[in-house]
Structures are given as C-alpha cells and as structure tokens.
Curated annotation (Swiss-Prot):
Residue ranges annotated for the ABC transporter domain, each copy included: 2-246, 313-527
UniProt-recorded name of the protein: Probable ATP-binding protein YheS
Gene name per UniProt: yheS
Organism whose genome encodes this protein: Escherichia coli (strain K12)
NCBIfam families per UniProt: PRK10636.1 (NF007921)
Family: Belongs to the ABC transporter superfamily. ABCF family. YheS subfamily.
Residue span of region Disordered: 523-559
Keywords: ATP-binding, Nucleotide-binding, Repeat
Pfam family, one: ABC_tran
Length: 637
C-alpha cells in the first residue's frame, strides 16, 4: 500500500501540503482532485522520485513497477508501434538478452529467456501495442510511421500508449484526456476500468472519473481528505462533512462568546478573578474549528444579448476545406436563438473545421452562409489564448473593451472569473494555461454574444470553473455550438447532437451512450475492411503514389517541424533555468536578510524563465495545431 504520513511539501516559501496524511490500498483506483495549484501534480512528482518531501514521509512497496506519461517526445525515426513497445522495459531487456544469447549460440540461456518471455506473454506484445494505438485513434498505416511524423498532440497519445503497455503495479496519470478527443476518452475510460493495478488519476472531467475511481483524495487547505466512492459520491460526502463542520463551528462560536462574556464581566472582580482566569486558559487551549467554505470561487453569467435575430445564421449547401481537399460537403444548418448543439465525430472528421467556418475564420469553398444583422459571435478556441497581450493585465484587456466603465466595476466582474487582488493587474505573460483560458472566457462573456462557438472550452479548467461555465451556459439565451470531450458539459448544456462524419453534418439520433455504440460499430466495420483483401493494395503504382504523397507532406510540413524543434530546444533551456531557480528557492537559508540580493535575483530568474516558457509553450501549441491539421488532411488524401 501507499502511505503518506504527516507529509509536508513546499514550493519556495509556499506550503502546498502540511501534515497531510492518506492511505491508498493495492488495487484501488484513486481520483486526486483539488483546485489548480493545490499540489496534485507535485504529489505525483514525489511518487516518481522527482522531488523530495520537506517533512513527514511516504512509503510504497519497493518492488512495484511504476508507469506514467512522459511529457517530452523527441522527433525519433523509430516507428510508432516500436516506440510504444519500449514502454514494456522488461520485454525490451529480455529481447536484448535473447539477441546476445543467439549470438553466443547459448542454448541454455535461450531456453531460459524464452521461458521468461512466455511468462510475460511477450508473443502478443505487438498486437497489444496495436490495440492500444487503435483505441487512441491511430490507423493501421500510422503504426509504422516514424514518431517524428506526428504532431505534439499525437506524440502525447504515443506516450500515453507507452505508459499503458507497461505491466505496472502503479499507474500515475495527470490529466490524460487533455490531448484526446471524445472517442479516445471513451476508449481510455473502458481500458482504465479493467486495469488491474493501483491507479492515481488527476482529472477535471467528472464523467471520466465517475466510472473509473473507487476513492477520492481531495487536496484542500494544505491537507488530504479521503472519501470512499466515485466523484459523485465524494460531492455528497463532502457537502455533509462541510455542513457538520459549519454546525460545529457555529456551536463552538457560541461557546467562545459565552466564555468571553464571562471573562469581560468578572475579570476585574476579585471574587471572580480566579474563575475568569480559568476560562481564559480554557479559551487558549481550545482548538478552534474553521468555518466551512463551500462556495465556488467562480461566479459569472451571460448578460442578455442586445438582440436575438431569428435565424442567427443559415447555411445552404456549404462546402469547406483546405486547398483542394474538401473536409465537409453540402452542409445545411439553421441556428436560431435557443439552438444548443453539441458536435460529435471522430478525430479529423471536421468538427473544428465547422466551428472555424461558423466563426468566419475559414471561408466556404462553395455555398452560402447567411448571417443575421445584429449577430454577435463569441468564439473560443485554444489558439485564442495566444492573442492575449503578454505585457497587459486582465483589467487592461477588459478596459480596452469597456473604456468608459469604472475600474471598480471591471474589478468586480473579473473577480467572478477568479482574478482578484494583485492578479487583476498582473501581466498575462506569467499566467498559466488555465488562467489565460479564464480570461479569454471573461472577455467573451463581457461582450454579450448571441451566438457562442466553443471548441474544447474546458481544457486547462479545473472542476470549479467547469461547473461555473456549465451553469452559465445553461442560462445562456442565444445559440450555442460546442465541441468538447467533457461529457458532463455536453449533457448539461446541449439539446441536440450533430454527427460530423464522412463529409456530412447531420443530426444524431441518440444520446452520448448511443454515440459510444456507434463508434464501436464503425470500428468493427473498419476492422473487417482492413482484413478483406484489396486488389490494388500491393500494386507498384499504389506504393509509388503513397510514397509521393508522403514526400509531399514532409516537404509541406518541414518549416513547421523546424520551428517546433527550435521551440522545444528553447523550452528545454528555460525549463533548466526554472529548475535551477526553484532549487535555490527551496533552500531556507536563501531567505536570510544577508542574502536578500541573491533572493531577488533568483526570483527574477524564476519569473523570467516562467514568462519565457509560457510564451514558448503557446507558440509551440499553435505550431503543433497547424501541423496536426496538415497531417490529418494528408492522411485523408
């Protein structure tokens, strides 16, 4: 089992965990939840032996095999399938030993190694690796492509598959759905439900957590609180605990007030001084109960749009694509106030293309898009985070939209999105991805849109912010079109589901459970097609055409690959600078008055590295998205 005992973890002068205690039994599947920045990822880093505890202890069996998702993937020439198989380290070691034994012609060693390979089911490893990759959205053709051919999002899927193929005793997953579409999320959920080891899962997706985990550890107020059951059960139990805590707090406050009243009345009287003194000591010894805080720190709503024209947007026989490649054909869509549409479809089918088309970021190849007079778009996509001005604060961004408004009104509004105190005037270059996403949403909400277009709006958002966004969208009066892998948000905010598939956009007759069945049926059909003989598959001309297309795609994507490689080197350098600064800041002696100048320099190095790293990461993300889109188009040709 894993035991955390009186654990203390600091980051510089900030305490993340203090005297925290928790236990995880073998085979348990634990959801690790809490606000962004509370220490969830730091706790996983502790288990991975990447950091040390500042106090207390933690233990788990030394024989346990750990697996986690690597965050970096070099541009390797190695085939995707072989890269994933590398995740089974014991298999690779035995494979190397077998090669050496064959070279020596050592029959005894060969027999022994074959026995070990049999014991770990080595002969099925290629099919197991292929199955993992298929589940995560890779085609048969992609299995043999080099890792360097894939964009960042797809490389993260390769890293995830590499972690899953490891025959681990303890699997650590930190937001594994961030780079996945809904199809892959559904597949991963099924895989994790059948996982036999111990799982610690960080996720802000309640629908993903619920069917998987049987325990929740909630990091709050520098402590770890344990709850048996899934996330929905945790919410009920926590509400009960907080209600009890509040009742105890109020009861204690009454007792404190009574004692204080006695002390104030009789302290000066000689006949009662002794009794008053005893009550003073009683107050001093009393362990005060904190009041319960259950409020969501985020609170906002969409103000009523200035107008609600009907229809807001109309499409007639619209086709869309990139260059000569048609992604969507003959789209017919009518959006009116109150339309609430969730887009479903496999990766690369064209969901984001449709959103861009609706937003006016992509011109139609043919057909007409009719926009109502008075339409006001609110468009959210991940690349918009880069449009924030790095040298400006949240209040400066908002003031440009509302130059006539009083500063206090702007501050009050931003407070609903979690920007309070100094955060309101802090430059966005220092912001995390979640903070930037919240600011972009705040700017959208302020403008009172009547048509909302949201492409994966919950990426980077924690559970509290997701809930606040969901509640605001439920009350939104205009039209909504959303792409999301967050099924709770889709269920709560949409009335109709549309399927983007085979160049078409059509109403889907069913719910999200029916969509899972549809995915399964399509996968079976494709597997049958793959197994069927194809007359031209091995023809010389087909191979020649395929090589030509691959060469053209490599040439087209080469500038982006070079830029991505440059950014990765820069991020590596900045990460090293940041690690160096944070290591120094972890030294308590650095905070002595005599080392004030050194501390200031160290803090400046930390801030500069964080700022540069954030800018590089956003540029890297944009380049990766462009590369991913080009590769998806190339694969479909």
């Amino acid at each position: 089992m894993i035991v955390f005992s009186s654990l203390q973890i600091r980051r510089g002068v900030r305490v993340l965990l203090d005297n925290a205690t928790a236990t995880i039994n073998p085979g348990q599947k634990v959801g690790l939840v809490g606000k962004n920045g509370c220490g969830k990822s730091t706790l996983l880093a502790l288990l991975k032996n990447e950091i040390s505890a500042d106090g207390g202890s933690y233990t788990f069996p030394g024989s346990w095999q750990l697996a986690w998702v690597n965050q970096e993937t070099p541009a390797l020439p190695q085939a995707a399938l072989e890269y994933v198989i590398d995740g089974d380290r014991e298999y690779r070691q035995l494979e190397a030993q077998l090669h050496d034994a064959n070279e020596r012609n050592d029959g005894h060693a060969i027999a022994t190694i074959h026995g070990k390979l049999d014991a770990i089911d080595a002969w099925s490893i290629r099919s197991r690796a292929a199955s993992l990759l298929h589940g995560l959205g890779f085609s048969n053709e992609q299995l043999e492509r080099p890792v360097s051919d894939f964009s960042g999002g797809w490389r993260m899927r390769l890293n995830l598959a590499q972690a899953l193929i490891c025959r681990s005793d303890l699997l650590l997953l930190d937001e594994p759905t961030n780079h996945l579409d809904l199809d892959a999320v559904i597949w991963l959920e099924k895989w994790l439900k059948s996982y036999q080891g111990t799982l610690i899962l960080i996720s802000h997706d309640r629908d993903f957590l619920d069917p998987i985990v049987d325990k929740i550890i909630h990091i709050e107020q520098q402590s770890m609180f344990e709850y048996t059951g899934n996330y929905s059960s945790f919410e009920v139990q926590r509400a009960t605990r907080l209600a009890q805590q509040q009742a105890m707090y109020e009861s204690q406050q009454e007792r404190v007030a009574h004692l204080q009243s006695y002390i104030d009345r009789f302290r000066a009287k000689a006949t009662k001084a002794k009794q008053a003194q005893s009550r003073i000591k009683m107050l001093e010894r009393m362990e005060l109960i904190a009041p319960a805080h259950v409020d969501n720190p985020f609170r906002f709503s969409f103000r009523a749009p200035e107008s609600l024209p009907n229809p807001l947007l109309k499409m007639e026989k619209v086709s869309a694509g990139y260059g000569d490649r048609i992604i969507l054909d003959s789209i017919k869509l009518n959006l009116v106030p109150g339309s609430r549409i969730g887009l479903l479809g496999r990766n690369g089918a064209g969901k984001s293309t449709l959103i861009k088309l609706l937003a006016g970021e992509l011109a139609p190849v043919s057909g007409e898009i009719g926009l109502a007079k008075g339409i006001k778009l609110g468009y959210f996509a991940q690349h918009q985070l880069e449009y924030l001005r790095a040298d400006e604060s949240p209040i400066q961004h908002l003031a440009r939209l509302a130059p006539q408004e009083l500063e206090q009104k702007l501050r009050d509004y931003l407070g609903g999105f979690g920007f309070q105190g100094d955060k309101v005037t802090e430059e966005t270059r220092r912001f995390s991805g979640g903070e930037k996403a919240r600011l972009v949403l705040a700017l959208i909400v302020w403008q009172r849109p009547n048509l909302l277009l949201l492409d994966e709006p919950t990426n980077h958002l924690d559970l509290d912010m997701r809930q606040a966004l969901t509640e605001a969208l439920i009350e939104f009066e205009g039209a909504l079109v959303v792409v999301s892998h967050d099924r709770h948000l889709l269920r709560s905010t949409t009335d109709d589901l549309y399927l983007v598939h085979d160049r078409k956009v059509e109403p889907f007759d069913g719910d999200l459970e029916d969509y899972q069945q549809w995915l399964s049926d399509v996968q079976k059909q494709e597997n049958q097609t793959d197994e069927a003989p194809k007359e031209n598959a091995n023809s010389a001309q087909a191979r020649k055409d395929q090589k030509r297309r691959e060469a053209e795609l490599r040439a087209q994507t080469q500038p982006l690959r070079k830029e991505i490689a440059r950014l990765e080197k820069e991020m590596e350098k900045l990460n090293a600078q940041l690690a160096q600064a944070e290591e120094k800041l972890g030294d308590s002696e650095l905070y002595d008055q005599s080392r004030k100048a050194e501390l200031t320099a160290c803090l400046q190095q930390q801030a500069s590295a964080k700022s540069g790293l954030e800018e590089c990461e956003m540029a890297w993300l944009e380049a990766q998205e462009q590369l991913e889109q080009m590769l998806l188009e190339g694969q479909s040709n």
